[in-house]
């Protein structure tokens, strides 16, 4: 009998495509088993792991759920931060709160995955969600709270039931991997939307010219992708696969995934004759059945887009950040 709730607690709607999902899982289960056996050999009961070319390759091919927390913590640097600051999270939970900040967070608690059984009631993950969001906002008081963080923390909590680890992963994302993304002016994340446009110009000039011709801004296309790190945008397992790379490599994977979402839909986009038609295609892009097959989708992101030299990306990023 088909379950109307997936393994992460998300209710499946009436339009859920069981056929596509079951076809994908029939293939993916053997891939998961193969990757799990390779990770077992690599990890061998270790409580930490060191970054290396092999670990990077393994992250790109997917981390088993049982190892994700440890690997994400280690390769991102969050584990080292937590060890250096053993009492920080506890102190933040006990400290005096900025009530207006907490009121803003409280508004988002009910909006966070209401279709998930673990977030739909007050005795589920809402309290841990509030705790982590409050601690992150108070530690980074100049940034405060940014809408979208609730979805990232929510997906982390579904996988990692340890609030403190989730807090340090968030702190590492905000301050190290994606610095300035969540500042109130959102200048950095907006600049990276322009960078996405430049990457499309570089990788597929025809699609870039067509989108520019119809005056569709890159910010309109990708702002939620980048702020939410694809949480509440793409299927959950696909998001976790993206995060396997994100915690190792930083923002570069966001550019790859975003570019692939655009370029694999080039024929639909080039057929559009207006601003509205293009934006409608982008609304549908995230529902494309090919994205359910997270393994093939990630392979395409790395194999079909060619290299993304760091020096060129940095130069393009600097140019985008200097724009008014």
Enumerate the language-model features and the residues they cover:
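N-terminal transition regions in large eukaryotic proteins
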Residues: 1-137, 153, 157-160, 308-324
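Alpha-helical catalytic/interaction cores of small GTPase-regulatory modules
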Residues: 159-160, 166, 221-287
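Hydrophobic residues within the alpha-helices of tandem HEAT/HEAT-like
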Residues: 153-157, 173-174, 178, 196, ...
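Short amphipathic alpha-helical segments embedded in low-complexity Lys/Glu-rich regions
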Residues: 72-77, 87-93, 170-171, 186-190, ...
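C-terminal regulatory/linker segments that are acidic, Ser/Thr- and Pro-rich
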Residues: 3, 17, 24, 34-37, ...
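Alpha-helical cores of eukaryotic small-GTPase signaling modules
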Residues: 90-132, 166-223
């Amino acid at each position: 009998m088909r379950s109307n709730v997936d393994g992460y607690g998300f209710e499946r709607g009436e339009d859920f495509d069981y056929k596509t999902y079951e076809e994908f899982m029939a293939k993916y289960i053997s891939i998961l088993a193969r990757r799990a056996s390779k990770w077992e050999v690599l990890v061998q009961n270790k409580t930490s792991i060191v970054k290396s070319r092999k670990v990077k390759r393994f992250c790109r091919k997917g981390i088993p759920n049982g190892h994700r927390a440890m690997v994400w913590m280690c390769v991102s640097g969050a584990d080292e931060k937590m060890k250096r600051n053993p009492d920080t999270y506890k102190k933040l939970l006990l400290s005096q709160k900025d009530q207006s900040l907490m009121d803003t967070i409280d508004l988002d608690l009910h909006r966070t995955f209401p279709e998930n059984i673990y977030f739909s009631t007050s005795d589920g993950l809402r309290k841990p969600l509030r705790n982590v969001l409050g601690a992150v906002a108070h530690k980074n008081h100049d940034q405060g709270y940014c809408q979208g963080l609730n979805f990232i923390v929510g997906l982390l909590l579904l996988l990692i039931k340890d609030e403190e680890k989730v807090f340090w992963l968030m702190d590492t994302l905000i301050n190290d991997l994606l610095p300035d993304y969540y500042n109130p002016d959102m200048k950095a994340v907006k600049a990276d939307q322009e960078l996405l446009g430049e990457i499309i110009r570089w990788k597929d000039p025809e699609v870039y010219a067509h989108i520019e011709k119809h005056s569709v801004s890159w910010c309109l296309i990708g702002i939620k992708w980048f702020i939410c790190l694809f949480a509440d945008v793409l299927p959950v397992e696909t998001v976790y696969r993206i995060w396997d790379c994100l915690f190792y490599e930083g923002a570069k994977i966001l550019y790859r995934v975003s570019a692939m979402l655009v370029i694999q839909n080039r024929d639909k986009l080039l057929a559009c004759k207006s601003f509205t038609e293009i934006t409608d295609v982008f609304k549908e892009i995230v529902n494309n059945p090919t994205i359910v097959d997270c393994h093939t989708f990630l392979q395409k992101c790395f194999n079909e887009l060619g290299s993304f030299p760091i020096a060129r990306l940095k130069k393009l990023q600097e140019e985008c950040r200097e724009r008014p």
